[in-house]
Amino acid sequence: MHPAPDMSLWQGRIDSQEGAGALRWHQWIRPYHESAGAASVLLGFASDEGVRRNQGRQGARQGPPALRRALANLAWHGEQALYDAGDIEAAEDLEGAQERYARRVAELLGRGHQVVGLGGGHEIAYASFSGLAHHLGRDGGTPRIGILNFDAHFDLRHAEQASSGTPFRQIAEHCEASGWPFAYCCLGVSRLSNTAALFDQAQRLGVRYLLDRQVQPWNLERSEAFLDSFLQSIEHLYLTVCLDVLPAAQAPGVSAPSAHGVEMSLVEHLVRRAKASGKLRLADIAELNPQFDNDQRTARIAARLVDALVN
C-alpha cells in the first residue's frame, strides 16, 4: 500500500476570469492512481537521516512539502498529465526507506512515467539510481547510465553507514558489482569543501567534474561542451541537483551553504540542455532545508528547477 499524497499542500491563486489558459500547478496536478497513463509524477523522499549521519544541519525531511507549496502557485504551461505520488518517509531507517523509494521509482518508470524526486537529503541519490538501475537492468543487459550531479560535493565518502555524503560511492560499488560502467559527472565542485582524499578518489573512479569557479558565465561554452561530451558517452541519464551547488545568497536553505557556488541561471541552463538531449530518464532535487530558508528563497529556486524538468 502506497502512502496517499497530501493534496492540501497544493493551494494558490485562481485567475478564473482569465480563462482556461490561466491555470497554475495547484489546479493541474492530481493525486496519483495506479491506472494513470504515462505522465509526469512527483515522488517525495522525506529524509534527513543521511544528513544527520553526515554531521550536517538537519531539516531536509521537511523539504518535499515545502517544495510542493512553492510549486503550487507557479503558472502551468504544460499539456501532459501531472500527478503527486506522495512521500516515502525515512525516519531513522534510511536503508529501508531507500529500498522502498527505489521500488516505487522502478514501478513508476515501468509504467512509462517521467519521475521527478523531491528531497530530502542527498541520500535520495542512491535510492533514485537503484530504482533506475532495477528498471533498466530487467532484461539482463548492461545499460550505460550516466549520473549528472550539480553539487558542491563529490559525495564519495567512505563510511560505515549510508549518508548524504556517500551516495555516489554506493553507486560506484553497485556498478562494479553489476559489471556496469560508472559514468559520473559532477558540475560545481567546491575545492574547499572536498578534501584531497576525495579528489584522489574521484580521479581513481574516473569522475568527470568542473569546479564551481569554472562553471561561470565567462566560461559557458566550455561548460556546455563538457556536458555535451558526457551526454554523448551515455544512453540513459539520471540527473540530480543538490541545492548547495548554488551560492548561499541564492540558496540559504540547505545543509551546507556555499560561499562561492554556481549561479542559478547557469544551473537552469545546463539542466535544460541535459533534458534536451532526450536521454533523461529520472531526476531529483535534493537538500532543501526549510528550517534555514529565507523568504522561501531556496524553495522557489527548487520549484523553478522542477518546472524546468517537467515542462
From Swiss-Prot:
Catalyzes the conversion of N-formimidoyl-L-glutamate to L-glutamate and formamide. Mn(2+) 1 binds at residues 122, 151, 155, 242. It comes from Pseudomonas paraeruginosa (strain DSM 24068 / PA7). HAMAP family: Formimidoylglutam. Binds 2 manganese ions per subunit. This is Formimidoylglutamase. Pathway: Amino-acid degradation; L-histidine degradation into L-glutamate; L-glutamate from N-formimidoyl-L-glutamate (hydrolase route): step 1/1. It comes from the Bacteria. Belongs to the arginase family. Its EC number is 3.5.3.8. It is an enzyme of class 3 (hydrolase).
